[in-house]
């Protein structure tokens, strides 16, 4: 899944494997702001379909990925990864305008 499609962790440094830029949403089922943002993320995934890939990672199910690899400390956390593998991180609930701005700035520029 994620390891073979998005990141390769086999070497010394993680390597981005995605064909397109992506947004990774680190969330928890018990996180209120995460649940409130979920419908917006679905809409944006459709809006940017074919240009930006979206992934949702449940931090409780993917403890190693969330905690050890990306060191996610608060939810929701969004990682915007461009085609070169550069990562921009945003933590906390944000509105659609901010999310779109981040996608346009960090994923599509």
What residue ranges belong to the model's regions?
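Thiol-based oxidoreductase modules, predominantly thioredoxin-like and allied folds used
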Residues: 26, 38-45, 49-64
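Short pre-active-site segment immediately N-terminal to redox-active cysteine/selenocysteine motifs
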Residues: 19-22, 27-30, 74
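Cys/His/Pro-rich metal-binding microdomains
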Residues: 32-35, 79
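A short glycine-leucine-enriched loop at secondary-structure breakpoints
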Residues: 68-73
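Acidic phosphotransfer microenvironment of two-component signaling modules
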Residues: 1-3, 63-64, 97
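A short beta-strand-turn-helix
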Residues: 1-22
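Non-catalytic, surface beta->alpha helical segment in thiol-disulfide oxidoreductase systems
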Residues: 74, 79-109
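Conserved hydrophobic/aromatic "anchor" residues
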Residues: 2, 26-27, 81
